[in-house]
């Protein structure tokens, strides 16, 4: 039953708006019709949206002051947006929430910076150790006899039997 009453009320308001607009349109000097129609539409929408919302919110909420304040702030922010302003009205609670969020984000960033700094220090220490191992040290004169295997080269007099062991020998094979 309440819905039918609400529907009748809405229809009567729309009829009232239409009759008002028709009387305005009959006046040929009226050049601001679109603006007036927009304002009336916004006001009607706000009226229809805010009153039931406020009733429900006040019935279900234990803290009606906060609900009323939030609804008023929301309505004012909507009107400011419609007027073209980018600024918004914020409640004190919202400012505190935003500050807490900013502080939390700053703490997270500081922890991240601390971790990255620690990793960078560890990487620098590792690079220093690698560099120290790769550093070229001069040892002075290098003994090249080991490189070309000249220590095992013997002359004919140094061989034990006096024969060259690398000369081919006559080999016989069994058939």
Curated annotation (Swiss-Prot):
Q: How is it modified after translation?
A: The N-glycosyl content is primarily Man(9)GlcNAc, with a small amount of Man(8)GlcNAc.
The protein's name is Non-structural glycoprotein 4
Q: Where in the cell is it found?
A: Host rough endoplasmic reticulum membrane; Host membrane, Host caveola; Secreted
Instruction: Provide one Gene Ontology cellular component.
Output: host cell rough endoplasmic reticulum membrane
Taxonomic superkingdom = Viruses
Bilayer-crossing regions: 29-51
Instruction: Name the family the entry cites.
Output: Belongs to the rotavirus NSP4 family.
The UniProt record lists the keyword Metal-binding: yes
Residues exposed to the Cytoplasmic side: 52-175
Recorded hits in InterPro entries, A to Z, give: Rotavirus_NSP4 (IPR002107)
What job does this protein perform? Answer: Plays an essential role in the virus replication cycle by acting as a viroporin. Creates a pore in the host endoplasmic reticulum and as a consequence releases Ca(2+) in the cytoplasm of infected cell. In turn, high levels of cytoplasmic calcium trigger membrane trafficking and transport of viral ER-associated proteins to viroplasms, sites of viral genome replication and immature particle assembly.
Q: Which GO terms describe its biological process?
A: monoatomic ion transmembrane transport; symbiont-mediated activation of host autophagy; viral process
Which residues have a glycan attached per UniProt? Answer: 8, 18
What UniProt notes about the protein's domains is: Binds 1 calcium ion per tetramer.
Stretches assigned to the Lumenal side: 1-28
Q: What is the lineage of its organism?
A: Viruses, Riboviria, Orthornavirae, Duplornaviricota, Resentoviricetes
Q: Which UniProt keywords apply?
A: Activation of host autophagy by virus, Calcium, Enterotoxin, Glycoprotein, Host endoplasmic reticulum, Host membrane, Host-virus interaction, Ion channel, Ion transport, Membrane, Metal-binding, Secreted, Signal-anchor, Toxin, Transmembrane, Transmembrane helix, Transport, Viral ion channel, Virulence
Listed Pfam families: Rota_NSP4 (PF01452)
Q: Please tell me where Ca(2+) binds in this chain.
A: 120, 123
What membrane topology does the annotation report for this chain?
A: Single-pass type III membrane protein
Kindly list the GO molecular function terms attached to this UniProt entry: channel activity; metal ion binding; toxin activity
Per UniProt, subunit arrangement is: Homotetramer. Interacts with the immature particle in the viroplasm. Interacts with host CAV1, early and late in infection. Interacts with host integrin ITGA1/ITGB1 heterodimer. Interacts with host integrin ITGA2/ITGB1 heterodimer. Interaction with microtubules blocks trafficking to the Golgi apparatus.
